[in-house]
Amino acid sequence: MSTPNLYDSTNKPLYGERLIEESKIICFDNPNKKRIYEISIELPEFTCKCPFSGYPDFAKLNIFYQPNSKVYELKSLKLYINHFRDLKISHEEVVNRIMDDLLNAAAPHWIHLNADFNPRGNVSMKLDIYSGQKRN
């Protein structure tokens, strides 16, 4: 009895890798533009790599926002976030890049991006970025 080959022997990217590589943030129309409401999204498995050591960095990202005319589509957001997993980038740069991309994709009234990086070498880091004015 032979064991099935779980890896693509042609070295082509697997379908999940292709989806991540091609990812972009997709939005859809806000279903209730007249109502002021807040959406929170938790992404607990964010990863990127330290630009100095190459070691992986892990974080939980939290996005809180008040939509304007567009709302983030969650699967596209998940794939977009996953494309950072092999990128060598500082915490500060990656969080600012994500915030820029979120703003460009949906232009929410207000947004708060929180990144809580796991400790490495007995040091942890949290970043918070805000944009816009919260509406009541």
Swiss-Prot record:
Ordered alphabetically, the record's keywords are: Cytoplasm, NADP, Oxidoreductase, Queuosine biosynthesis
Keyword Oxidoreductase found:
yes
Pathway terms, separated by semicolons: tRNA modification; tRNA-queuosine biosynthesis
Upper classification of the source organism reads: Bacteria, Bacillati, Cyanobacteriota, Cyanophyceae, Synechococcales
List the GO biological process terms. queuosine biosynthetic process; tRNA modification
The answer on whether this UniProt entry bears the keyword Transmembrane helix reads no
Official protein name in the record: NADPH-dependent 7-cyano-7-deazaguanine reductase
Question: Where is it predominantly found?
Answer: cytoplasm
Q: Which family does it belong to?
A: Belongs to the GTP cyclohydrolase I family. QueF type 1 subfamily.
